[in-house]
Amino acid sequence: MLTIKDIHALEVMDSRGNPTIQASVILSDNTKASAIVSSGASTGKREALELRDNDKTRFLGKGVLRACENVNTVIKHNLIGLEAINQAFVDGRLKALDGTPNYANLGANASLGVSMALARASAKALNMPLYRYLGGANALTLPVPMLNIINGGSHANNSIDFQEYMIMPLGFESFKEALRASAEVYHTLKKLLDEKNQLTSVGDEGGFAPNFKNNVEPLEVISQAIEKAGYKLGEEIALALDVASSELVDEHFNYHLKGENKILNAQELVAYYKELVAKYPIVSIEDGLSEDDWEGWAFLSKELGRQIQLVGDDLFVTNASILQKGIKKNIANAILIKPNQIGTISETLETIRLAKHHAYQCVMSHRSGESEDSFIADFAVALNTGEIKTGSTARSERIAKYNRLLEIEHELKGGIYIGKELFKHG
């Protein structure tokens, strides 16, 4: 029986220069694998706890030595000797060791690092690719990338309220062709921004962070870039938004669009979205309303839920019980999947299975604070999520995921690129 022989954690750096955890697991056959945990900039209030040291003398309080110590002591001592390939049992032990609903004691960064490293080590020991180990024989589908090519909100220091303007290359036969087209649009966009004397500095996720007069201008210039690059707007490449509206809302559920000097209630904001969807080929809006504005979400879902994808990120925080509440209330029709919002691979799997059972789309996602770790690329293929958000075609921590997906596509001898089939349901 393959068992856990040793576990240890190290404080390393993420793509924003902040500390994070690298966890390593060694199995009884001496197979070793590691995983690096990502970290978010805009976070949902119901996310599992990311344990930080709060020692202002180190990394401005953002150190993770306490979380590393938890891995190197409590977690290590309680997991050594357990069967490695029983991921659900080990993850259950991690949850029980912590004893809180949100990993407030050990830290979700500690638990997830170990959970990821264990899955990777087990796959390696069995001489299987990670996507095959996690997904079995049905792991065949390459996801549609949602590439964040203009950054605003908390991901950039500019005047744009919406956090992400994305492109979705739906009209292609393969992942590699979809990615090539996206890269060409990205480079064409840079030239257009240069011509407009706009900044082409990039945000946390590799998208450009120019200053526009309002939140519509980015849609215009991206549309121009798609067509100038030689692609059909809406048919081959569609648009998507992540509004991250929990960052815009006040205690009265009014939404402050500072870039446009507007304050809108939920109904007015939904009307604004409807105008944008009517004018531009927007196929997905993420976090269109605040995580606490469930009444507003119900209205948004009623008004646009049959027309486009409505993704809950801060709304659901990859949590099966919160998703279940949304399902009962007919809120949203898709969920963003971020393993570090929930704490272990097994809990992430539970949420994905629940979503799929109720015909909610799943979008595998990175965080703004990333690393060279490409786990989510394998995870997206393993669970056939159909979509992946992992930044633009810039910054090596984003490219690592795309390169891994290209590698998987090659291993699968093409696999299945879901493309336009993504939204052909219901």
UniProtKB/Swiss-Prot annotation:
Enzyme's top EC category: lyase
Single GO MF descriptor: phosphopyruvate hydratase activity
Pfam families associated with the record: Enolase_C, Enolase_N
Active site: 205, 338
Localisation per UniProt entry: Cytoplasm; Secreted; Cell surface
Pathways per UniProt: Carbohydrate degradation; glycolysis; pyruvate from D-glyceraldehyde 3-phosphate: step 4/5
Gene Ontology biological process terms, A to Z: glycolytic process
EC number(s) given by UniProt: 4.2.1.11
GO cellular component, one term: phosphopyruvate hydratase complex
Cofactor: how and how many bound: Binds a second Mg(2+) ion via substrate during catalysis.
Reaction(s) catalysed (UniProt annotation): (2R)-2-phosphoglycerate = phosphoenolpyruvate + H2O
Residue ranges of the TM segments: none
Cofactors (names): Mg(2+)
Residues given in the record as Mg(2+) binding sites: 242, 286, 313
Similarity comment: family membership: Belongs to the enolase family.
Function: Catalyzes the reversible conversion of 2-phosphoglycerate (2-PG) into phosphoenolpyruvate (PEP). It is essential for the degradation of carbohydrates via glycolysis.
This protein's name: Enolase
Gene expressing this chain: eno
